[in-house]
């Protein structure tokens, strides 16, 4: 079986905006993803949502409608309790065990990675693509900066085997 390249793009999407859709469209032009799963958080532990889960889910469905290779994954919206990335990553890795999974996140989220639940395990089981976000520079002396220095690759092919790399 030929493995697929699957991106996972999670967030609160409160609200979803043009920046979110532009990032995905740009990634699809640059990287040969077979699919990108957009996953709205159900109960994000780092943020308080203003809109209801149903409203955010509807916004995400509308924003990404018609973009090839995009699927909206509702698993976190329907999960009880906090939405931890490690749980979702484990589920996706089990479901798509023959495929290459890349977790997509903004530099703002990655700069706080060491505050995430089971963050070290998360970093060790999945490859991450960090998207630069205006006004959110990663301090090279922070934990996130250190992780980038230790795990960074500039070659997408490096993500086709193993885990724990950062692009």
Model-inferred region functions:
Residues 1-167:
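Nucleotidyltransferase catalytic core that binds NTPs
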């Amino acid at each position: 079986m030929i493995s697929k390249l699957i991106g996972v793009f999670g967030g609160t999407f409160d609200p979803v905006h043009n920046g979110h859709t532009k990032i995905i469209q740009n990634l699809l032009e640059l990287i040969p993803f077979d699919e990108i799963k957009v996953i709205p958080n159900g109960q994000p532990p780092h943020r308080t949502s203003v809109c209801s889960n149903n409203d955010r889910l509807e916004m995400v469905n509308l924003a990404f409608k018609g973009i090839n290779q995009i699927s909206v994954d509702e698993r976190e919206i329907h999960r009880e309790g906090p939405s931890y990335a490690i749980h979702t990553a484990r589920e996706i890795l089990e479901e798509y065990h023959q495929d290459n999974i890349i977790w997509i996140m903004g530099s703002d989220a990655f700069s706080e990675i060491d505050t995430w639940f089971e963050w070290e395990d998360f970093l060790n089981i999945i490859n991450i693509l960090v998207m630069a976000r205006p006004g959110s520079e990663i301090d090279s002396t922070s934990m996130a900066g250190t992780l980038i220095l230790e795990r960074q690759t500039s070659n997408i092919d490096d993500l086709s085997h193993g885990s724990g790399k950062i692009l």
